[in-house]
Amino acid sequence: MKIGVMGAGSWGTTLAKVFSDAGCDVTLWARREEVAREINTEHTNSTYLRGIALPHTLTATTQPTQALCDADVVVLAVPSQTLRGNLAEWCADIPQDALLLSLAKGIEKETFLRMSEVIAEVTGAQPDKVAVLSGPNLAREIAEEQPAATVIACTNEKNAQRIQHALAAPYFRPYTNTDVIGCEIGGACKNVIALACGMASGRGLGENTLATLMTRGLAEISRLGVAMGADPRTLSGLAGLGDLVATCSSPLSRNRTFGARLGEGKTLDEARAATNGQVAEGVISSQSIARLADSLGVDMPITRAVFGVCHRDQNVADMVAALMGRTKKSE
């Protein structure tokens, strides 16, 4: 199977490696010439995956048309808030019969659309040809070939199975699901809860606090998912609970690390500077998810608290006090 991976960051490069290790013909699109050259000549991507040896069968290009040409599966590995613009540039070259696989985890800021909805809207692809990947998938660990599992969600189960077979490597086990909504909501919302866990950790708070945030965070993610039509069982699986635990617990998680810097007292700009100018996905998603929840009448207090810190200049201590001072109720 021919795979075109659009985006050579840590996650895109890792998935390109997995597809290659599973026996696929993979072309990886990189925005920067030096990244593509290094992948082709040194078989490494030191900018995003330092120390990881890439398969010699994996080729890179800076030409989108070359990566997309005759692809059976197009993997979209760009940030959620840039997906629409990138797709507008690429859609004319995406093969009509290709399956589209989204790696982005977020809700579009202005439209409140999920990533699969953005893909279908911009490309004109039928929803049953758009799939999403979600699970406890920290890129570095998978690139190191540590055993992991993931979920491929598509409303067409046969199309999900096609991607599942193409992506199955000795160290990477994909499951399938037809609940695209649940997988996308779990993937988008966990970044916000991970920010909250990072903030708590940055303030020196302990495991009880983190466990409380994760558990109650899962409860509010489930409320939103169900309100949008998700199967609640999805959110207790790999794409919900699994992804949440990994992202909230690991120092490899960009969202958790960014939150920890905010918890230590850094401003948003200072935290961004400490991460080479990158803003964690959860910072952007907290705004769109909080507003989406409001529009649906869904109570998401942790998400709203993170939104307050990131977009309303509230401090972390006040966030904790507000959460602990909420009206008492049953679980």
Swiss-Prot record:
On whether Lipid biosynthesis is a keyword of this UniProt record, the answer is yes
EC number annotated for this UniProt entry = 1.1.1.94
Q: Name one GO cellular component term.
A: cytosol
Q: Which Pfam families match?
A: NAD_Gly3P_dh_C, NAD_Gly3P_dh_N
The pathway that the record names for this protein is:
Membrane lipid metabolism; glycerophospholipid metabolism
Molecular function via GO: glycerol-3-phosphate dehydrogenase [NAD(P)+] activity; NAD binding
Question: Where is sn-glycerol 3-phosphate bound in this sequence?
Answer: 105, 135, 190, 243, 253-255
Which residues are noted in the entry as NADPH-binding?
10-11, 31-32, 105, 139, 254, 279, 281
Q: Which UniProt key words apply to this protein?
A: Cytoplasm, Lipid biosynthesis, Lipid metabolism, NAD, NADP, Nucleotide-binding, Oxidoreductase, Phospholipid biosynthesis, Phospholipid metabolism
Where in the cell?
Answer: Cytoplasm
EC class, as a word, reads: oxidoreductase
- The reply on keyword Nucleotide-binding is yes
Active site per UniProt: 190
Query: Where is this protein chiefly located?
Result: cytoplasm
Which transformation does this protein catalyse, written as a reaction?
A: sn-glycerol 3-phosphate + NAD(+) = dihydroxyacetone phosphate + NADH + H(+); sn-glycerol 3-phosphate + NADP(+) = dihydroxyacetone phosphate + NADPH + H(+)
A GO biological process of this protein is:
glycerophospholipid metabolic process
Top-level taxonomic group? Bacteria
Could you tell me what this protein does?
Catalyzes the reduction of the glycolytic intermediate dihydroxyacetone phosphate (DHAP) to sn-glycerol 3-phosphate (G3P), the key precursor for phospholipid synthesis.
What family does this belong to?
Belongs to the NAD-dependent glycerol-3-phosphate dehydrogenase family.
Q: What is this protein called?
A: Glycerol-3-phosphate dehydrogenase [NAD(P)+]
- Say which species the protein is native to: Corynebacterium diphtheriae (strain ATCC 700971 / NCTC 13129 / Biotype gravis)
Gene transcribed to yield this protein? gpsA
